[in-house]
């Protein structure tokens, strides 16, 4: 299933990953007890035929602060918001907005877990609709490790019938 409207059901989950490049650019500024995080990353999209050959360019802003009792025991919490532009070429583009916060990821490590929504599409993706749960590396993990890490999206995507 490619997630077209007439084939899509609530149970259809389309999983894909953004393999984040090692040349991500982030800055960290102090603001009292918090740090303001901003920057961008790029990556190849893999794992879903509908999005095959796409590149993601994502921008984010957020803050990092000391965890308290309600923060699942994490010493430091990242709270991030961003926009990703997924492009096959200049004409076939998807825009998604997302937000996440430090939580326990699928593998038990600290990850930024949250939600995304597909807000705009052009070309092949005109009329796109849907949302996703996301699990992404923390900004500080990307800064420290300097390795490609995946951002995993579990999406429910629909497109209008193109007859």
Segments the model singles out, each with a brief description of its role:
Residues 1-4:
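C-terminal segment of classical bacterial N-terminal signal peptides
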